[in-house]
C-alpha cells in the first residue's frame, strides 16, 4: 500500500509543475521542466543501484543551473534585450553554486544523510524523493525561467 501512495505522490509531483508549465503556453518553460525531471530521474538510477544519497543535493544544484541557463539560452535574442535576465541568471547561479557546494561538502564530510537511511532501500520511496526534488527545482525556478521566455 505504501508503494502505491509513493507512486501517486510521484505522479502528482511530476504533473503539477508540468501542468503549470503547459498552462504558461510556452514551449521553453515546458521543456525546462521536463529537463529538470529527466536529470533527476537519470541521477536516481545510479543512486538507487549504489544506495547512496551523496549526489542528491548536487544533482538539485546542477539541475537548477541547467534549467536556468537552458531557459536563458533558448530565449536569447541579444545581450541588450536580455541584460536583466543575464544578471538574474548569474546571481541565481552564484547562489546555487554556493548552496550546492556547501551541501555536497557536508554530505561528503558526514558520509551520509541520516534522513535517507530508511528511504534508500525502498525504490518507490527513494524515487518519490528524487521526483519531489525535481518538483522543488521546477517550482522555484519557474518565476525565472518563464520571465526570459516572454514575448512582448
Language-model segment annotations:
Residues 11-23, 67-74, 142-144:
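Membrane-embedded alpha-helical segments in integral membrane proteins
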Residues 15, 37-45, 66-69, 138-139:
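Generic alpha-helical transmembrane segments of integral inner-membrane proteins
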Residues 49, 53-142:
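Intramembrane catalytic core of multi-pass membrane enzymes that act on lipidic substrates
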Residues 1-11:
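N-terminal membrane topogenic signal
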Residues 17-30, 46-52, 75-78:
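Short, hydrophobic transmembrane alpha-helix segments
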Residues 7-8, 29-37, 87-90, 127-131:
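Hydrophobic alpha-helical transmembrane segments
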Residues 143-152:
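Single conserved hydrophobic/aromatic residue that forms the stacking wall/gate
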Residues 27-41, 53-65:
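Loop-to-helix transition at the N-terminal end of transmembrane alpha-helices
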